[in-house]
Structures are given as structure tokens and as C-alpha cells.
Amino acid sequence: LNAPDRHTLLDYLLSRPLILEHQDALLVHAGIPPQWSISDAVQNAELVHQQLRTNNPEKFLSKMYDNEPSSYSDKLSNEEKCRYTINALMRMRFCKSNGELEFNHKLNIDQTPVGFKAWFFHANRILKDKDIFFGHWSTLKGFNIEHIYPMDHGCVWGEKLSAFRLIDRTLISQESIEGN
């Protein structure tokens, strides 16, 4: 939040949803906790947007980067619910089936921390039949599981920038101009 154009950036981000639903697809930065339905995810994302619109956004955001709470509960304060929601939708890779988040590992999927799984591997995941497009995990390139579309193909690391055209279900990729 120290960028000289932070107010312009914040205004833009305030206008963007944390989760986007289009036809039978969901778009999210990192993932959706396995215990959440679409309405849970949208409702909690809207709570974050309400807080951003009604409070000082810079002050609110300064309280959001923390690893706690690592689990969601209706008993959490609104601030804690917002922090969990931001962490889940924006930072999550590994979690437990109850949605307990793990942030210490940024590893490939075959290096899962003990007791955790990739958020989309949980057998009890509610959104099994919904296409979910997400980024945030460049080591998943080439990964294939039904209804799960990891879209971070490592452009920032000199690899590919990718997009998915929903109308004809086409993946479009462009090599990074930086190269490896």
C-alpha cells in the first residue's frame, strides 16, 4: 500500500469482486474452501466488500494480512471472517477438509504438508460439479482434474500467460516476452 498510485489501485480493487460467477463457472484468485457452497463464498466475499466500502480501506486492509484465524466459524467477529475469507480466496493452497488453512508451504502438489491436501482434493468438497478457475499456484501447470482449472502458468517466472475462453472452452496461452 505504499505505491504512489495506491488510491487509484484501491479504487479499482474496491470495484472488483473477490469471486466471480459466470454461467457454470467460478473465478477466484486462489481457491474456495471445501466446506463452502457458492452462496457461502459469495456471501463472505460480499462481507469483505461491505467492510471495504464502509470503513477506511487502507486501515481495513492493514489488518487483513495475518494467518489467523486459520479456520472459519460463525462465531468469528466480522473482522476475523473477513480475514479468513481473504486468506481463503486469495492465498489458500493447502487446507484440511474443514477449511483449516496452511500457509507455510508454497510447494508443488506432490509435496503436501502432513495432514493437509490441496483445497480441490478434499472428498467432501461441496463444489465438485462447478468449474473453478483460479491462479496463485504456478507449479500446477499441466495439472488436470475435472472442473478444476489452474490458470497460473508461470508468466511472472518467464513462462506463459493463459486465458480460458468460456464460450468455446478454449485455453489460450502466450509465452512470456521475458522468456526463461
Where are the model-predicted features located?
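Residues that form or immediately flank small-molecule/cofactor binding pockets and catalytic motifs
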Residues: 18, 32, 94, 137, ...
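Short C-terminal domain-edge/linker segments immediately following a structured domain
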Residues: 55-63, 120-121, 162-167, 179-180
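Active-site neighborhood of divalent metal-dependent phosphoester bond hydrolases
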Residues: 1-78
